[in-house]
């Protein structure tokens, strides 16, 4: 098992803020752990340009190149162009708890955006914005310093020298397709880099980019 621990500039502890939400999903996880098979939980720090699946007919990079564990599947998605925490398990109930909006499981993202968001923009993210698939739930949103634990991205982001960039810490309690990117674009600050740091009780917690660890209890 490949593991790597960062010895300096360690990551901060996970922290969530509770938000009152009213919209719930009736979606159910269809994967069920075979009887008598023990639960497995794998945490992976997904690099940029890696698909959150084990096979790809087009020959793109997949989880198979990094994780030699069979029978586990990602709880939710993390887009190919996003980085950070991916929780994989063979337990359907755990997958549902981590991904269904009705469970109100927080997911923390560190997001580099173009420009410096105003307080009005932050308040809009916190209160919810209306996207083409409907209004978003209330979210946590705050302007933060660049994370001390940040790893270099390969390739680097494309940024315009004439426009500054900044970092946001965003906490979501739902999981729509490319939601963070659409939310920041909606308030006028496009996402340049997106890193998921935590899902519920699971976090990167010093796990290096491209590495995995077994988090089975």
Swiss-Prot record:
Gene3D superfamilies: Alpha-L RNA-binding motif, Pseudouridine synthase I, catalytic domain, N-terminal subdomain
Keywords, sorted A to Z: Isomerase, rRNA processing
BP term (GO), one: rRNA processing
UniProt keyword rRNA processing, yes or no: yes
Catalytic activity field: uridine(2457) in 23S rRNA = pseudouridine(2457) in 23S rRNA
Entry annotation: catalytic residues: 79 (nucleophile)
Enzyme class: isomerase
Pfam families: PseudoU_synth_2 (PF00849)
InterPro entries linked to this entry: PsdUridine_s_RsuA/RluB/E/F_cat, PsdUridine_synth_cat_dom_sf, PsdUridine_synth_RsuA/RluA, PsdUridine_synth_RsuA/RluB/E/F, PsdUridine_synth_RsuA/RluB_CS, RsuA_PseudoU_synthase, TruA/RsuA/RluB/E/F_N
GO molecular function, one term: 23S rRNA pseudouridine(2457) synthase activity
Coiled-coil intervals: none
EC number: 5.4.99.20
The family this protein is said to belong to: Belongs to the pseudouridine synthase RsuA family.
Name of the protein in its database record: Ribosomal large subunit pseudouridine synthase E
Natural source organism: Escherichia coli O6:H1 (strain CFT073 / ATCC 700928 / UPEC)
Lineage, top ranks: Bacteria, Pseudomonadati, Pseudomonadota, Gammaproteobacteria, Enterobacterales
Gene name linked to the record: rluE
